[in-house]
């Protein structure tokens, strides 16, 4: 539970651009993508999703050239706009390209929900976020940008909840991506809920109360919306792990079935199809043991991967490593 809380700390395009006169600069486009996979979800999350696209320096000047694509998944409680405001991914990408990283397109989809995060899961309550990312978004980007439209030229990465999404989607959709990079992936192991935590969660009756609730309560509702949905049970449309003070083991079993450490043995053959898999985590991150366990599980099944523990906490290495580790990783492993 402590680890979880610490970790959780294609359609019409409407384009607005930030263009630079300097040919060495990247171009940022803000678009909207309509997702049939998300339409009509009971939670009320919009099926029109904001997406930030970073185009490499030569994109405008080389109209015949096509590029590989890296899809970048954000963490819990933020959007791509907030991620850009904090970390300046466009500036990071521009520096990386100047320093020899091969040019690629970067795509940052918004998966923020009423409970602050989609968990990149398929849910009868929140919508089919797996299909949005792997089908609707990829299809839109391939149709509207000069991509190299095959799995060998697609990568997937993410941090925290986005790291979880990278592992989850990577396991299930090897036909879409060829390389994976998970940064400080959260939620890899099955969750547990104490009776006291169960009482706190049961006390929340409205969305307004949920928004003002302690972090643990909010993240638990996020997990329930993703992994134990119940579209016939308003206002949250979820099954909770405690009801009337009694533990409901089947709900925890549903959550455990969505934990990558439990899922991995089912997807060994899928994971063996990847060109490259990388995992990193800070030595002061509460997730370090679970991320190491993922690396060790991959090793046990003979799935090639690289694993690095660096000096840092949950968020301290994201900016520097996106430039010096993540983008060079895809530069080496994607097909250009």
Walk through the language-model features, giving the residues of each:
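Non-catalytic cap/lid and distal C-terminal segments of serine-dependent acyl enzymes
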Residues: 20-336
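Positively charged n-region of N-terminal signal peptides that target proteins for export
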Residues: 1-4
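Bacterial N-terminal signal peptides
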Residues: 6-16
